[in-house]
């Protein structure tokens, strides 16, 4: 019923009341319309929560951004008309990220996900000016009253891939294409190496950095240089499938990263370490919808235990015995009985960084700037422990 119809109804009631009992009842008739108006407002469906995602790469990268966008789609499917989502891809880490984030606020989004490390300071700045908006920043460490830092334990997937790599290499030389030398990526390289060493102590790991998250030509060039240097199994912490495709062409082995990349190199593919962001995105969105979202002074971590990290599409080339070892590791990560970063662990200078039975906490893991024993070279700008 429109407001004009309500007014007509009110005047009709007034006239009828006046005819029956006189002028003393004139003020009651307009009041009778108010409950109907309030009921109509109460029954109207709530507007959907507007959610925006800022992506560092294209949604078709087959890796990192692809995984985030799959989770966005799953979020829409699960929550239906309670939410409406949008995304902006290829948002570079730099001042332009702030512009994009401010645009998202201006468009009325009340929950914004920034999905790469380099957005951190820009998101923190925007969050300070938009207190009615909730912000979620992936892989960073800074937080505020309306901004979370969240991360997946990708190093668990890296370790599991390493178990396979250590058992499959013939040359005992592994190659890793690194993206940006921040603790997250260094941690993954080290965890991959530790996993390989758990089944083959002779392995050593070579690393080539491209200093970008996604650049397929550079990724392919780096992969080829590692193959030329003697590596026969490749791993990556970059966002496209170029490393796997390079291994496929060379008749060597490699892994998928962040998403299942089997289709890009079915002969080379040994397994894919994948991230499922959906559980976290659904949980966080529900908290915003029902008003239970709360600040967290520390980063929120999700891994194998929470269903965020897995290793999938394991090749038939991987022997059953090696698969059994892998499944035991996965089970231990799931129930908490196994810790990847448990001492003794030494860096590649021979310095003990974790004593026997000492287990690294999340703060320690988030500050790794060294290579473990078995990884060649030095971390660019690192090696502080």
What are these regions (language model features)?
Residues 1-12:
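Bacterial N-terminal signal peptides that target proteins for export
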Residues 72, 159-203, 207, 297-319:
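An alpha-beta-alpha
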Residues 108-116, 136-138, 229-238, 257:
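Periplasmic-binding protein-like
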Residues 150-172, 274-293:
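Hydrophobic alpha-helical segments within soluble ligand-binding/sensing domains
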């Amino acid at each position: 019923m429109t407001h004009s119809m309500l007014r007509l109804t009110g005047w009709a009631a007034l006239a009828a009341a006046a005819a029956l009992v006189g002028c003393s009842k004139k003020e009651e008739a307009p009041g009778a319309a108010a409950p109907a108006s309030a009921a109509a407002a109460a029954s109207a469906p709530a507007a959907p929560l507007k959610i925006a995602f800022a992506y560092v790469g294209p949604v078709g990268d087959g890796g990192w951004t692809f995984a985030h966008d799959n989770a966005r789609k799953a979020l829409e499917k699960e929550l239906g008309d309670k939410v409406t989502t949008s995304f902006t891809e290829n948002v570079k880490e730099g001042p332009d990220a702030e512009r994009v984030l401010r645009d998202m606020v201006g468009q009325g989004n009340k929950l914004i996900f920034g999905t790469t490390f380099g957005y951190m300071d820009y998101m923190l700045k925007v969050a300070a000016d938009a207190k009615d908006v909730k912000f979620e920043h992936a892989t960073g460490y800074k937080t505020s009253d309306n901004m979370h830092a969240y991360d997946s334990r990708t190093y668990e997937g890296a370790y599991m891939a390493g178990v396979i790599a250590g058992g499959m290499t013939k040359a005992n030389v592994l190659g890793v294409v690194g993206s940006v030398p921040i603790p997250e990526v260094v941690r993954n390289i080290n965890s991959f190496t530790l996993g390989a060493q758990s089944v083959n102590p002779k392995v050593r790991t070579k690393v080539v950095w491209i200093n970008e998250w996604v650049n397929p030509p550079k990724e392919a060039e780096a992969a080829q240089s590692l193959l030329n240097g003697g590596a026969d199994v490749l791993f990556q912490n970059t966002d496209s499938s170029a490393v796997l495709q390079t291994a496929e062409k060379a008749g060597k082995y490699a892994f998928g990263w962040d998403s299942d990349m089997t289709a890009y190199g079915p002969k080379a593919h040994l397994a894919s370490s994948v991230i499922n962001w959906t559980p976290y995105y659904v949980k966080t969105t529900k908290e915003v919808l029902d008003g239970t979202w709360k600040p967290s002074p520390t980063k929120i971590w999700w891994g194998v235990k929470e269903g965020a990290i897995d290793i999938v599409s394991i090749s038939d080339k991987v022997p059953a015995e090696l698969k059994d070892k892998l499944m035991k590791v996965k089970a231990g990560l799931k129930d908490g009985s196994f810790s990847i970063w448990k001492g003794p662990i030494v860096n590649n200078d021979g310095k003990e960084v974790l004593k026997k039975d000492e287990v690294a906490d999340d703060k320690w893991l988030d500050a790794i700037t060294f290579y473990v024993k078995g990884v060649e070279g030095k971390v660019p700008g690192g090696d502080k422990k």
